[in-house]
């Protein structure tokens, strides 16, 4: 089930796991080196409107989590990825 793999990412629950699935990602490793701003813009198009900007911050955190092998604990908190 897609929820399990994505839910290993800090800040990602069932709803955001579904968003990632709808964007075409099938595993956490698929997020490596992706562009969070592009992910957010594409999801806004899929959903038919602007989404809460906090989702962008979670995407930034998720890409960091997937792309790096050693993690700074502060950067695993999505709210630390605000503009």
What residue ranges belong to the model's regions?
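C-terminal extensions
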Residues: 1-10, 14-83
